[in-house]
């Protein structure tokens, strides 16, 4: 980790750079896989599963028997934990239901919105070094609440052709309709265009590596919607002298163990805390099973000392972290001044892990500075809002002349005429 003291504003841009990925030829590679899946369907997906996931599959779909067996392989303790998390996620996201009210904008003119679930959604759950069954809950639970009729899930199998039982248990619990053994670019392409087995969906959700991210971006150009641009995970801890260095170090490491391209940053007003956190990170790192991954990630990480909370907040809002932990004396007051962040964790007893798993908030969040413009996944991500309007005779009389005037000045005579013929009909009735 890099220790930095009182950096000038001129240094901030360089200071806040995310780890750079080598994307040379990335999109060309991804595009060729997408085109192959689009043309050849299941045959191409099975071929790429053999190539990239090193598994020979006879079919892509997970069978009911596999789901049933998976339930017996998950411990009662983990089942209880997953069920508790599901309940909290359900409670929080159900509270976000949209209730559209009819609004009379003027006499005889009424407008309103109706919320409708996206009919078919696709969820991508990465494989890699950890089974992310928590992400199944974060995506499938709000999809179910939103009223999505078909929830399709793709996740890469292991070399024996099996999916982690906790992923299957969570998927069944959350109401996933269909599960497929497919990972990477081929999974995104299958959901975007459909194959003999995998249904075409209207919107794709879920994290992934740079290939998955590139695939989502390419298919979203014209064929399907996606949740948001995604990149390596990140956390910032904003702390003052009141913070516990043990807690801060644990939070930084919990992010660092995600992957070698993750980023963890401390911004603090206390030089003493900066020094103590550095030592504590080294101590805790030595005890972690995933210490090699975390250590590599920490090369991208920084402990930054600033002069006061005003500067800390300015730097924070410039960085726009995916996760922001505020461990300061008056953390609620500090939180009020945060304008750019994906999800915020307040006080010394609120670790990022809580939001990652079970507090109820969603952990699918904007990274790479996109928190300046994007929100994290919520119930709104799975719905569309359709607008309605109704105009009665008194309404068209009141609003009609204004429409005619505006249409005439935009030289759109047919627009004007659509109102004029109605006004004449009312006059002659």
Q: How does the language model describe each region?
A:
Residues 103-169:
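Conserved small-residue-rich beta-alpha loop and adjacent elements
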Residues 318-429:
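C-terminal core of ALDH-fold dehydrogenases
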Residues 98-103, 225, 262-267, 287-297, ...:
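Flexible, glycine/charged-enriched surface loops at secondary-structure junctions
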Residues 175-263:
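Conserved NAD(P)+-binding/catalytic subdomain of aldehyde/semialdehyde dehydrogenases
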Residues 1-7, 178-183, 303-308:
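Short acidic-hydrophobic, aromatic-tinged amphipathic segments that line or gate anion-handling sites
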Residues 258, 266-341:
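A glycine- and small/hydrophobic-rich beta-loop-beta segment
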Residues 1-119:
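N-terminal Rossmann-like NAD(P)+-binding subdomain of aldehyde/semialdehyde dehydrogenases
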């Amino acid at each position: 980790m890099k220790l930095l003291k009182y950096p000038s504003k001129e240094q901030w841009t360089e200071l806040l750079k995310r780890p750079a990925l080598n994307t040379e030829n990335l999109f060309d590679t991804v595009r060729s896989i997408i085109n192959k899946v689009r043309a050849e369907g299941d045959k191409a997906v099975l071929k790429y599963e053999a190539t990239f996931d090193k598994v020979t599959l006879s079919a892509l779909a997970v069978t009911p028997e596999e789901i049933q067996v998976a339930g017996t392989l998950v411990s009662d303790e983990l089942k209880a934990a997953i069920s508790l998390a599901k309940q909290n996620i359900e409670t929080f996201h159900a509270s976000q239901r949209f209730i559209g009210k009819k609004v009379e904008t003027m006499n005889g003119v009424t407008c309103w919105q109706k919320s409708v679930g996206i009919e078919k959604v696709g969820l991508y759950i990465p494989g890699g070094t950890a089974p992310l069954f928590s992400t199944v809950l974060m995506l499938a639970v709000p999809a179910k609440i939103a009223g999505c009729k078909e929830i399709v899930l793709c996740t890469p199998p292991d070399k024996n052709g099996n999916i982690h039982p906790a992923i299957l248990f969570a998927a069944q619990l959350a109401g996933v309709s269909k599960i497929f053994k497919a990972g990477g670019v081929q999974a995104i392409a299958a959901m975007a265009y459909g194959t003999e087995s995998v249904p075409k969906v209207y919107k794709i959700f879920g994290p992934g590596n740079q290939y998955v991210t590139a695939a989502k971006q390419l298919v979203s150009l014209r064929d399907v919607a996606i949740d948001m641009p995604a990149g390596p995970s990140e956390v910032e801890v904003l702390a003052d002298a009141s913070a516990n260095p043990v807690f801060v170090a644990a939070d930084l490491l919990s992010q660092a163990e995600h992957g070698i391209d993750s980023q963890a940053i401390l911004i603090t007003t206390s030089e003493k805390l900066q020094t103590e956190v550095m030592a504590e990170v080294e101590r805790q790192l030595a005890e972690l099973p995933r210490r090699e991954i975390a250590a590599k990630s920490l090369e991208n990480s920084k402990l930054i000392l600033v002069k006061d909370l005003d500067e800390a907040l300015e730097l924070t809002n410039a960085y726009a972290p995916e996760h922001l932990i505020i461990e300061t004396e008056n953390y609620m007051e500090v939180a009020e001044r945060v304008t750019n962040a994906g999800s915020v964790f307040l006080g010394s007893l609120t670790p990022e892990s809580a939001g990652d798993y079970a507090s109820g908030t969603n952990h699918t969040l904007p990274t790479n500075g996109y928190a300046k413009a994007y929100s994290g996944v919520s119930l709104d991500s799975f719905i569309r809002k359709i607008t309605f309007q109704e105009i009665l005779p008194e309404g068209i009389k009141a609003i009609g002349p204004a429409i005619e005037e505006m249409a005439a000045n935009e030289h759109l005579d047919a627009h004007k005429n659509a109102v004029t013929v109605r006004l004449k009909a009312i006059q002659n009735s």
